[in-house]
Amino acid sequence: MTAPSKPVLVADIGGTNARFALADVDASVPLLDDTSREFAVVDFGSLGEAARYYLDQIGVQATQGVFAVAGRVDGDEARITNHPWVISRSRTATMLGFSTLHLINDFAAQAMAISLLRPQDVVQVGGASWRPAPIDQARNYGVIGPGTGLGVGGLIIRNGRCFPLETEGGHVSFPPGTPEEIRILEILSEQFGRVSNERLICGPGLVNIHRALSEIAGVDPGPLQPKDITARAAAGDPRSSRTIDLFCAIFGAIAGDMVLMQGAWDGVFLTGGLVPKVLDSLQHSGFRQRFEHKGRFSAIMSKVPSLAVMHPHAGLLGAAAYAVDAQRQHPGEQR
C-alpha cells in the first residue's frame, strides 16, 4: 500500500461495525480500497479510539477526516440508536489531532457515492441506460435503500458541486396499490397504528409482509427472520416467494413516487444490505411495472434508470466523495 501524501481518513459507522479507509482527493479513484478495514464497535470505547487503532495498524498519520454515521447529525454530535458510542466531532478531532473532521449522515454518504460510481459498480434494473456524466453537468438523482430500516435521499449536482438531500422519506405513509396490499395495510395497522413505508420495505418489513400473508391464509408462520424468508423463497416456498414479489413491487412503487417528489429524473440508485440479496427478484418482478405506473407521467418514468449499487463499500465511497467535494469548495482545506 502506498499512502497519499495528504491522506483523508474516511469512515462508515454503523450500529454494529465501523469501517475505515483512506482517501486521496487528488486521485481519479479517490477511495483506496486496499486500505479498508472493519471493526466491531463493541471492541472500542469510542470512535476516536477505533480510528486511532486503524491508523496505527496501517502506519499512516492523517490530519483530515470524513465520518459517515448511521444516525442524525446534530451540530457537533451524532447519535445512533442502541449504540455504545457518544460521537462528538470536536472531541474526536482533538483526540486524533485532526485539523478538519466532518460528520455526515450515512445516507448522505450513500447519495454522495453516486458522484464516484462507475458502470461496473451498478446493475441496471430498468429504464434508460446510465453512464457517469461530467461533474459540471447538472443532474438530479434519488437514492433509496432497505436495510435495517428504509433510507431515502437524493443528490443534486450543480456547477461542479454535490448537494446531498437528507430526508426521512422511509417514514412516509404506505400507499397500497392493490386490494391485496390494502388487506396487508389493514393487518399491519392493527399492530402498528400508522404504517410507514419502512414497515414493509426493509429487513423486518419482509417479516411483516410474510406474517400478514400468513394471517390472510389463516396459518401461523412461527418465528421468522428475513434470511429465513429469502432462503424459503429460493427453495420454492409459495408464501415466501409471494412475500419477495410483493416486497419488490411495493419497493418499485415507492421508488417511483420518490422520483416524482424529488424530480430525480436522472436516475434512482438502490442501495442497502438487502438489495444484493433480492437483485434477481428485482430484475424479474413487478418492480419496474410499479415504478413506471404513474398515470400521466408513466411515459417519462419509463425512461428513468433504476440501478442497484453493488459497490462493496458505498458508504466509504460516499465519504471519500464528500472529501473531494470539500476540496473543490475549499481548496486549501485538504492541503
From Swiss-Prot:
CDD domains: ASKHA_NBD_GLK (cd24008). GO terms for cellular component: cytosol. It holds the Pfam family Glucokinase. GO terms for molecular function: ATP binding; D-glucose binding; glucokinase activity. Its main location: cytoplasm. Keywords: ATP-binding, Cytoplasm, Glycolysis, Kinase, Nucleotide-binding, Transferase. The keyword Kinase applies. It catalyses: D-glucose + ATP = D-glucose 6-phosphate + ADP + H(+). Its EC number is 2.7.1.2. ATP binds at A11, D12, I13, G14, G15, T16. SUPFAM superfamilies: Actin-like ATPase domain. One of its GO terms (biological process) is glycolytic process. Belongs to the bacterial glucokinase family. This is Glucokinase. It comes from Xanthomonas euvesicatoria pv. vesicatoria (strain 85-10). The lineage of its organism: Bacteria, Pseudomonadati, Pseudomonadota, Gammaproteobacteria, Lysobacterales.
